Amino acid sequence: MSIWIGVDPGSKGAVAAIYNDNGVQRVAVAGWDNMLFVSFCKAFKDRADENGEQIVAAVEKVGAVKGNGITGMFNFGKNAGYIEGVLSTLNIGYQLIPPVVWKREFSIVGKDKSASIEVCKRLYPDVSLLPTERCRKESDGMADALCLAAYAKRKL
């Protein structure tokens, strides 16, 4: 058995995990918060260690975003470094996956942000992509993270 983690490092990013629980596939998705990310990854790393499971993460490879400016690019890079630091510290293997690569896997290259939400609804219809109970709009960051976890399950 394995645990697959997907990480969308954007400002409205998220983290997701796909794992097995007594033979049943489960999915966990959480919005972005630095401390939540640490506890999320640590919980799954502990689970993997206890059960002799492998754990791997697919992290979206980030680059400069046109129109973000210098401060925005710096913060984006700082966040990406934080993610890699946490995964390395917890000894969770990871790969940086360019957006075009994982999107090609789900045939959504060049489509708008709602495309990943539609993929998740098709693959995991019971999973909520609402950041909070009060939200009405599904999070494309949570959908991207779940797609990255699904990509990891298929390819890593």
Segments predicted by a language model, with ranges:
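Phosphate- and other anionic-substrate recognition elements at nucleic-acid/protein interfaces
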Residues: 1-156
